[in-house]
Amino acid sequence: MKFSTILTGSLFATAALAAPLTEKRRARKEARAAGKRHSNPPYIPGSDKEILKLNGTTNEEYSSNWAGAVLIGDGYTKVTGEFTVPSVSAGSSGSSGYGGGYGYWKNKRQSEEYCASAWVGIDGDTCETAILQTGVDFCYEDGQTSYDAWYEWYPDYAYDFSDITISEGDSIKVTVEATSKSSGSATVENLTTGQSVTHTFSGNVEGDLCETNAEWIVEDFESGDSLVAFADFGSVTFTNAEATSGGSTVGPSDATVMDIEQDGSVLTETSVSGDSVTVTYV
């Protein structure tokens, strides 16, 4: 952004207001570059990073970091969904985030920044070795918001897409596709602006897929060694939610619903209807 040499006081104030977010956004990008921001499998609420393993026998489960819908089956090679980028604000969990009183979360960072992430993925629950995923982070601090598109092949870290701009209200389509258990692609399309970015994984990944899970998730992701303070995102609805298994397309109607529980409080409410998955902050 360029400014003229003569600035009014209001322009100076606007620039000053934007500065903290700019620094935080830069810090997040540097953290990604240093390998510090990543998603995780779903954790059991109140545990020290114990993975919640779904068995498909219950309609709803609670996790400390995942909300949304998870299909359990075999041969999932593609997952896609569309959502509108939400307005985001400070969450009710406070700047200390989740679980400052025990175990892994004792060292939760003190911060005024709140974030959440909407993504689609293959594996990560009943299959713990890998997650192929892509989505959008949305963050809030001091009245300012930012949105970043990313891709990840867990257990490696997440990496930003650099050639796409995302704003509140944009319609986004996210797709992951596995061409083998160690290769595939992640694509984010901004249907509002016409921009599209893809990252291709050509083997040499840190973990192989099992292709047993397909998911549409809003996550309280990890930065450094702790979960970020969870943002109030209103609601995110994945529409045209589809997964491909054995050449056939399936929707989320038979998925297990997951909601986020932290410190004894349920922070989300998830519902599935037809080909849509809605996650609401409560």
Swiss-Prot record:
CDD domains recorded: Peptidase_G1 (cd13426)
Pyrrolidone carboxylic acid modification, residue list: Q110
Signal sequence region: 1-18
Propeptide residue interval(s): 19-59, 99-109
Disulphide bonds in the chain: C115-C139, C127-C210
Enzyme Commission identifier(s): 3.4.23.19
Keyword Membrane included in the entry's annotation: no
Biased composition regions of type Basic residues, renumbered to the chain: 27-39
Single GO MF descriptor: aspartic-type endopeptidase activity
GO biological process, one term: proteolysis
Enzymatic reactions: Preferential cleavage in B chain of insulin: 3-Asn-|-Gln-4, 13-Gly-|-Ala-14, and 26-Tyr-|-Thr-27
Family matches, as SUPFAM superfamilies: Concanavalin A-like lectins/glucanases
Classification via InterPro entries: ConA-like_dom_sf (IPR013320), Peptidase_G1 (IPR000250), Peptidase_G1_sf (IPR038656)
Keywords in alphabetical order: Aspartyl protease, Cleavage on pair of basic residues, Disulfide bond, Hydrolase, Protease, Pyrrolidone carboxylic acid, Signal, Zymogen
Enzyme class label: hydrolase
Gene3D superfamilies: Peptidase G1 (2.60.120.700)
Region (Disordered): 27-46
Subunit structure: Heterodimer of two noncovalently bound light and heavy chains.
UniProt record similarity statement: Belongs to the peptidase G1 family.
PANTHER family listed in its UniProt record: PUTATIVE (AFU_ORTHOLOGUE AFUA_3G02970)-RELATED (PTHR37536:SF3)
Annotated protein name in UniProt: Aspergillopepsin-2
Species this chain originates from: Aspergillus niger
Lineage of the species this protein comes from: Eukaryota, Fungi, Dikarya, Ascomycota, Pezizomycotina
